[in-house]
Amino acid sequence: MGSLNNEVGSIKCEVGSLKSENSFTKLPSEESLASESKKVTPVSSDFELNCGSLAPTSLSFPAMKFEDDIEIQSPDNSIWESFFADHLEGDFMISSPVRNLPSPQPASSFSSSHNNGNNNNNNYNIYAHRQGIHGQDMMMCSPPRSPLGLYNHPSHKGKGLSPLQKVFNSPNNQFMQIESFNLPALESFLDDDYDKEEDLASSYSTLKVSGTGVAGSSSESFDALSVVPDDLLECLALPSSLSNTSGGFMESLLSDTSAVQVINPDDEIFRTGSIAPLSQQLHQERQQEKQQKQRPVTHARPQQQQIINHNVLVPLAAAPDQEQDSGLQLVHLLLACAEAVSKEDYMLARRYLHHLNRVVTPLGDSMQRVASCFTEALSARLAATLATKPSTSALKPFNPFPPNSLEILKIYQILYQACPYVKFAHFTANQAIFEAFEAEERVHIIDLDILQGYQWPAFMQALAARPGGAPFLRITGVGPSPEAVRETGRCLTELAHSLHVPFEFHPVGEQLEDLKPHMFNRRVGEALAVNSVNRLHRVPVNCIGNLLAMIRDQAPNIVTIVEQEASHNGPYFLGRFLEALHYYSAIFDSLDATFPADSSQRAKLEQYIFAPEIMNIVSCEGPERVVRHERLEKWRRLMEGKGFKGVALSANAVTQSKILLGLYSCDGYKLTEDDGCLLLGWQDRAILAASAWRC
């Protein structure tokens, strides 16, 4: 099926000065890094997973092994060559998913076509192609952003238009405005067969879309056809094997020292049995996929009859246009059901859900899988609404990861290694903090969501290689579980000791809304940075202002914020639903291009990371709804309202992000600049936004 990427957040007051964009700190050269490394005790090569805590027992992962020594070449950025070449050997660095990295691109390929030709000063003309992101976001996108360099070249188009993209990129997209959103009624195909299981497959009518989108105006409508069971089944059936655009991506994703284990479909998730690398698992999956492709598809009609008889959708060969029609129908059914829920027409919503449950599956293409997540979320919302004694406490509390710590580590590591999203957030924030700490002898970082501490080993190594030696580093780690935060601190302390970095860790086991100034243990003479990655959106609306004011009063040198670029906190349910469908469709599409078809690793990411987010956004209200993503413009207004000023991310940060994306064979990832901030997206839909601030 085609792409589903439609368009689906620093601070020191009179303490120090930040460097201008033309004088950003450069990391040490390769020679100095090599000489410094000889003085440093090497990091332990054993990575032990702790099943009883939220954090690993050691942050010293085994070195990544490549067939050849790989060096990221950049003629005008020798500092980055040494940095990345040294850190390609660790899981917390840029772990290249492509073992046989192609020859480096010329320096000009990393800059816009209007580059002035001076490649020796790290001056990237990132404003040369300033323009709006291709396609307008449905909830009023941010001001015009400029695509950056090679990864936004027209030749890198990725996959084609998807059903959702056709809907959102429609020339007439007034329906994006919630006030005017009006889906046509679909009762005609829902009338007589709702309670007749034996007649459902034959009476299900196909939907046709008018030329400009779902519902450009009230005059637009679906054409409810009569009985067409065969064509419908062909259209809604899943393809036997999904097309894979990643080429040889997964065969060389990770080294043989990866800590991810073989997952047997018959065993429990992440059973600690025989150990094998993630690359080997994915290689096996691709081999199975190739074998399935070689088998001739026969007896399609009996399979369709089996679908009717057993009420189960099984993979069938489907033409691209049939997949497109199927995707469009799923989109329209989802939107119609969401509109019925928003209008409190629960009987009609139940009818739509009844049909959705018959045609969606978590095992199909990206549209089928994302539709399955949203169908489940709509069902949960409707069930809670229609309960005899409604109680929000009956809903499971939101937890973005499974409770078992070993599963947390493994799933998070899959996401960290296979996709650039988390690395982009960590490296971009680290670069801004590193530059703000230039020449400082005592530095303090407050991490508002420390988790397993994955962000900081690379930063520690950069400090250890700094000319003149590493400064004294203190990290205050914040997290809801005191035990987990302390365990992360123990691991980071061991790593800092091995790197000869003077280090102190201060754990704070509190929710962000419960933080008090004395918990930061601020000390005179320390340069302070506050870091938040995908965390501030979960702070209650009535607490976020006080939290930011308290951070401002600490007079930090820099505040780094990375947040999901989505508007999932609007006042209207239908608007949140539309935005979430758009956003997660792009994410699922990027996973489709990254993993092979029927990948168990991809299924775990979707089931344990993204599906719970969708469930919380769609099914929960009030205090139970904690996934409240906001767009960059909202964070910008909020930060400026609390006395912060934006700090433009440097050319080095842009270069670093481009090198990171160059390590992934998928060509759908896009890097965009927006008034000094960087956005990483899939195709024309921004996914993450990174920004830096000071007071």
Curated annotation (Swiss-Prot):
The keyword Ribosomal protein does not apply. Coiled coil: none annotated. Disruption phenotype: Ineffective symbiosis with arbuscular mycorrhiza (AM) fungi (e.g. Rhizophagus irregularis, Simiglomus hoi and Acaulospora scrobiculata), with rare colonizations characterized by malformed arbuscules. Reduced AM fungi-mediated induction of AM-related genes involved at later stages of symbiosis (e.g. VAPYRIN, PT4, PT5, STR, STR2, RAM2, SBT and BCP). Induction: Accumulates after inoculation with Rhizophagus irregularis. Residues 528-616 are annotated as: PFYRE. Residues 328-393 are annotated as: Leucine repeat I (LRI). Transcription factor acting as a central regulator of arbuscular mycorrhiza (AM)-related genes involved at later stages of symbiosis (e.g. VAPYRIN, PT4, PT5, STR, STR2, RAM2, SBT and BCP) but not required for early genes of AM (e.g. common symbiosis signaling genes). Required for the morphogenesis of arbuscules upon symbiosis with AM fungi (e.g. Rhizophagus irregularis, Simiglomus hoi and Acaulospora scrobiculata). Also involved in restricting mycorrhizal colonization of the root meristem. PANTHER family: OSJNBA0084A10.13 PROTEIN-RELATED (PTHR31636). One of its GO terms (cellular component) is nucleus. Residues 321-694 form the GRAS domain. Residues 283-292 have a biased composition (Basic and acidic residues). PFTA repeats lie at residues 105-139. Its main location: nucleus. Residues 619-694 are annotated as: SAW. This is GRAS family protein RAM1. Keywords: Cytoplasm, Nucleus, Transcription, Transcription regulation. It is found in: Nucleus; Cytoplasm. A motif (LxCxE motif) lies at residues 335-339. Forms homodimer in nucleus and cytoplasm. Interacts with NSP2, RAD1 and TF80. A motif (VHIID) lies at residues 443-447. Residues 412-477 are annotated as: VHIID. It comes from the Eukaryota. Residues 281-304 are annotated as: Disordered. It comes from Petunia hybrida (Petunia). Belongs to the GRAS family.
